[in-house]
Amino acid sequence: QTNVIAFKGKNQDEILSAMNATNRNLWRKNSSTKDGVTFTDSFSSKDAGPLTAMLKHVAKRNGVVFHSDEYFVSMLEILGKKSLCGISYAYLDGKELAGALFVINPESKTMYYLHAGSFDEAREHNAGNLLLSHLIFMALNQGLDYFDMFGVSPPDSDSTHKWYGLSRFKRSFGGEDVTYNGTWEKGMHKLKYEV
């Protein structure tokens, strides 16, 4: 289960209008000021440090577990060279507030929002909302067709579901829920897989 924004035939204003009022207003207000949150994008593993620090902060704050720092660095070293995996940061006054790791699939023309984290100060400035809007518009401006939130809770989930808050956040950007069949394996060596 995921949530996908389809860009085909849409411009930035149309994508923005599909977002909830909070996200629309935050983006418009931030875009109209010189002192607002700014963004940087990188495909270099050398820029992974702030993101991994943010993920550790989120893990401690929310009691979740993320991959090791080496996992994220390896993704960037391997896929970043081809501009298929990158990091975006939201800054205010030169300080990183929020960061996100994304992957681009050129065959499906899709950007995937894989991992994101922030420091506590990010909430005060809505940096996470602004960063996700930035990524969505970056994907649109790169000529991609889709932006995949990479996982949401089932649509009928109530507030007790562990992904409820995160899923509500992801859905507030105007995408549509999509359900896939899941992952399947096909054994290639019959003797190894017989029960």
Located regions from the model:
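A conserved beta-strand-loop-helix scaffold within acyl/acetyltransferase catalytic domains
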Residues: 1-123, 138
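Terminal substrate-recognition subdomain of acyl/acetyltransferases
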Residues: 1-37, 151-195
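Aromatic (often tryptophan-rich) hydrophobic motifs at membrane interfaces
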Residues: 73-189
